Amino acid sequence: MRGKHFVFMLFAAFVLFPVSGFAQTYAIRNVRIVTVSGATIPSGHILIQDGKIAALGPNITIPSSAKVIDARGLTAYPGMIDAHTAIGLTEIDSISATQDINELGDLNPHMKASAAINAQSEHVAITRANGVTTVLSAPDGSLFAGQAAIINLDGWVTKDMLLKDSAATIINFPRDVRLPANANDRQRRDAEDARRKRLELLRKTLRDAQSYARLVDAKVDGDSDLALRALVPVVKGEMPAIFTVDTAAEIKGALDIADEFKLKAILSGCAEAWRVADLLRSKNVPVLFSGLLDLPTSDLDAYDSHYSTPAALSKAGVKFAFSAGGASSVRDLPFQAGMAVGFGLDKDEALKAVTLYPAQILNIADKVGSIQEGKVANIIITDGDPLELLSHVKHLFIAGKPVELKSKHTDLYDTFSKRP
């Protein structure tokens, strides 16, 4: 009898208090639509159903059940994407309890960022309020740091946010030796030796993964190695390997490793990508550029070498996307793209480098990156160019759901603007 009562009460709860996650139909009317992948629609409508873009254009049928948003005078853009961040894995640098980005040891390719992402991170709301709706959240620290996850910036728990788990494996390429000018010969030898050993470990691990892949294909029984098993799709070219690099020498070294082991490589960081732009184009390797606001790597470089790198990559024909990096700085992603426009990057290319291009590089362009029928409805509606500092996001949709623009920043503003 109690079981029947429980079932009845459960049924009544669903009828009287429907789950908030149930999809609703929305219509954004009279809005300028920058599709990014096609022509801009001067004035049209966007229909959102079941979390996706169902229709768009100047003459579409809008169901009477749709919740209508009149966006006259505003512009719709696809939600922006940062293709290499630490959002959800780190909160406050000085508080170790909020850090879940590093694991001990050098070989952690089996560690998944999705297992540690904090959906309630303050960085989530702050970042999306500036129009960034999707990020790649990546581990750091180790040589093989782990597997990154692509998430939408809305959801109660990680499962709600997850767009693609195990999207790429992060490999922190051994850094060039950088010592002060007064370093002695022994210090230089020790540093070079340490770097050489890390390169040897990188190659050995990838060779072992290739051997392990052959055993897996042959269905040979034996003890399972979690780290090597996680690298099987990487050495088979089924999962991208994101190499973090900065100098031209590091970029060349990572490209050599990618060629040697036939990896599907993506380069992240790339402060000196401008030095090897033609090489990157010839290798057809995409770049996630995150050094725009950094100082030049050499005192002999021009002051604007980093600011002009996106223009140099674009001119050379290198597919690239912007990455603000870290967690707290991701909110500045659109403004970094805007700054690059001031140093020679075409304005349309800058917009694509924070929308369509990162989606293509991360192999999620069938879901996000542009405003097209059938794609996930990640849409921002602004009162101006989203790459300009004085523009504001007025409405935000993530996975077809309107999302509040409140954040820790707006809460603090509201609190202290009332101060007597």
Tell where the protein language model's regions lie, with residue ranges.
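Divalent metal-coordination and catalytic microenvironments
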Residues: V31, I46, G51, G73, ...
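Bacterial N-terminal signal peptides
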Residues: F8-P18
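His/Asp/Glu-enriched, well-ordered alpha-helical/loop segment
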Residues: I92-D93, T98-L104, P109-H110, P240, ...
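C-terminal cap of metal-dependent C-N hydrolases
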Residues: V31-V34, G44, Q372-F416
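Metal-associated gating/positioning segment near the N- to mid-region
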Residues: L74-G141
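Histidine-rich, glycine-flanked metal-binding segment
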Residues: I33, S37-Y77
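Polyanionic/metal-chelating signatures
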Residues: H123, R128-A265, H392
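Boundary at the C-terminal end of the N-terminal hydrophobic targeting segment
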Residues: G21-T25
